[in-house]
Curated annotation (Swiss-Prot):
The keyword Ribosomal protein applies. This is Small ribosomal subunit protein uS11. InterPro entries: Ribosomal_uS11 (IPR001971), Ribosomal_uS11_bac-type (IPR019981), Ribosomal_uS11_CS (IPR018102), Ribosomal_uS11_sf (IPR036967). Located on the platform of the 30S subunit, it bridges several disparate RNA helices of the 16S rRNA. Forms part of the Shine-Dalgarno cleft in the 70S ribosome. It comes from Geobacter sulfurreducens (strain ATCC 51573 / DSM 12127 / PCA). The gene is rpsK.
Length: 131
């Protein structure tokens, strides 16, 4: 005879009041990841094109980055966030559309900084594709 199933009680995520934060947009050639943190660096909300249901080459589109940024902004606004500082990293196509989506969601953007790592002649790059 089966024992009665126990219900797992999950604690609700507490809503912190964080008025301003930092938005990190990482735009690679294959995906776009948006992370919103508090000024210290603790993650408040995150989203990516892949987590929003886009697969394969559709993850790298500007539209996928826009949808991911809107979702991330909605989660952060639930914590009372109103203004962000934006750090953009990477060469991907979702850079501008993710930034525009954050502004359209109602965030006041204090400043935008490009933090793409540029090698001072470091590792050898991968060879060119021949299609």
């Amino acid at each position: 005879m089966a024992s009665p199933s126990k219900k797992v009680v999950r604690k609700k995520k507490e809503k912190k009041n964080i008025p301003n934060g930092v938005a990190h947009i990482q735009a690679t050639f294959n995906n776009t990841i948006i992370t919103i943190t508090d000024p210290v660096g603790n993650v408040v909300a995150w989203s990516s094109a892949g987590s929003k249901g886009f697969k394969g080459s559709r993850k790298s589109t500007p539209f996928a980055a826009q949808i991911a940024a809107e979702e991330c902004a909605r989660k952060a606004q639930e914590h009372g966030m109103r203004s962000v500082e934006v750090f953009v990293k990477g060469p991907g196509s979702g850079r501008e559309s993710a930034l525009r989506a954050l502004q359209a969601a109602g965030f006041h953007v204090n400043f935008i900084r490009d933090v793409t790592p540029i090698p001072h002649n470091g590792c050898r790059p991968p060879k060119r594709r021949r299609v």
